[in-house]
Amino acid sequence: MSQKERPTFHRQEVNKTIWEVPVRYQNLSPVGSGAYGTVCSAYDEKTGLKVAVKKLSRPFQSIIHAKRTYRELRLLKHMKHENVIGLLDVFTPATSLEEFNDVYLVTHLMGADLNNIVKCQKLTDDHVQFLIYQILRGLKYIHSADIIHRDLKPSNLAVNEDCELKILDFGLARHTDDEMTGYVATRWYRAPEIMLNWMHYNMTVDIWSVGCIMAELLTGRTLFPGTDHINQLQQIMRLTGTPPASLISRMPSHEARTYINSLPQMPKRNFSEVFIGANPQAVDLLEKMLVLDTDKRITAAEALAHPYFAQYHDPDDEPEAEPFDQSFESRELDIEEWKRQTYEEVISFEPPVFDGDEMES
C-alpha cells in the first residue's frame, strides 16, 4: 500500500467494531474471530474474488503482540505457493506512522477446511493421495525457507470444491499450556517430541502431523485422540512401540528419559493390521511418517517421491522458497520499533499479479 496511490476508504460496523477498508472491498460479513483478530468475508470489486479480510486485534498492545504482528505479516508476504495461503493485500487506514494502529490482512476466502470434508464422507484412496500430496508440496516449500508450521491439523487446511488445498496459519503457532490441555484437537496432531519437550525439534514435527491427518482421511477417525498428554503418549506408543534406547539416550531432558524408561516395553504394531484395507503404499508411507526418531522420519521432499504419489509427483513442479530472513526472531525491540518495522512492511507490499484464474472456493 504505497503512499502515492492511497485508495479511498469506507467505514462499516462489524460486531460492534468499526472497520475502515478500501472501497474495493464490499459486503463485509463476519465469518469468525480468534484471539488475534476478526475475519470477514468480502467481495473484492477489483479482482472479482471473494476474499477474507482479517483485522488484527490490538496488534501493538504489547511487545509480544507487536512482534507477532510483524511475524505474521513477514511470513504471509514471503509465501508465494499454490498450496500455501498467501497475501493478496495488506492495508491500514492510517496515513502516517504516528496514527498507525490497525492492520488488515487480505487472503483468499477458502470455502471449507479438511475437518468439514472428513466429517461429510469417507474419502477414496485417490482423494487421499491428492490431498496429502498437496499438503506435502506446500510443506516442502515452507520447510525450504526454514519455517516450521508446528500446528498442522485439519482445521488449518483449506480445501475448495475441486479438492485444491492451501495450508493456513503456519509459523505462528505458539500455543499456551492451557490450550494444549485435555481432550483437544490442538494436541492430537502434535509430534511427541514437541508435545513433551523431549528435545530440540526439527521440520519433521510437521510430517508427524501429516501422518496423523492421512491416517484420519483413510479411516474416518482421529488416530490419537488423547484425553491428556500422558494418555496421548500411551496411544502413540501402542502403535509405534516404546522408543529404542538409542533414541532415549539422545533426549537432553533428564525428566523425559526417566519417564520413558519407567514405561512398560511395548512392541511396534504391524501397520497393515491397523490400517486394514488401505492401499499398501499408503500404509508404507504412514510407517515412514509416524516414526518416533526425528532423524529417521521421512522429509516432505522425500515423501513427495514416494510411490504412493506416482500419479501426481512432478519433480519439476514442486518448487522451493526463497530464503526467509528470520533474524528478527532473536531481536529484542520496543513496541515502537516493531510498529515502525511493521509499518515499513505494510507500505512496501506489492500485490500479486492477478491472472484471472485464481482459486475460487
Swiss-Prot record:
Catalytic activity: L-seryl-[protein] + ATP = O-phospho-L-seryl-[protein] + ADP + H(+); L-threonyl-[protein] + ATP = O-phospho-L-threonyl-[protein] + ADP + H(+)
GO MF term set: ATP binding; MAP kinase activity; protein serine kinase activity
InterPro entries for the chain: Kinase-like_dom_sf, MAP_kinase, MAP_kinase_CS, MAPK14, MAPK_p38-like, Prot_kinase_dom, Protein_kinase_ATP_BS
Activity regulation annotation text: Activated by threonine and tyrosine phosphorylation by the dual specificity kinase, MKK6.
Keyword Nucleotide-binding: yes
Residue list for modification Phosphothreonine: 181
CDD domains in alphabetical order: STKc_p38alpha
Residues that bear Phosphotyrosine: 183
Domain of life, source organism: Eukaryota
Principal location class: cytoplasm
List of residues binding ATP: 31-39, 54
EC number per UniProt: 2.7.11.24
Catalytic residues of the enzyme: 151
Enzyme class: transferase
Post-translational modification: Dually phosphorylated on Thr-181 and Tyr-183, which activates the enzyme.
This protein's UniProt keywords: ATP-binding, Cytoplasm, Kinase, Nucleotide-binding, Nucleus, Phosphoprotein, Serine/threonine-protein kinase, Stress response, Transcription, Transcription regulation, Transferase
Family per record: Belongs to the protein kinase superfamily. CMGC Ser/Thr protein kinase family. MAP kinase subfamily.
Domain comment in the entry: The TXY motif contains the threonine and tyrosine residues whose phosphorylation activates the MAP kinases.
Name of the molecule in the record: Mitogen-activated protein kinase 14A
Organism per entry: Cyprinus carpio (Common carp)
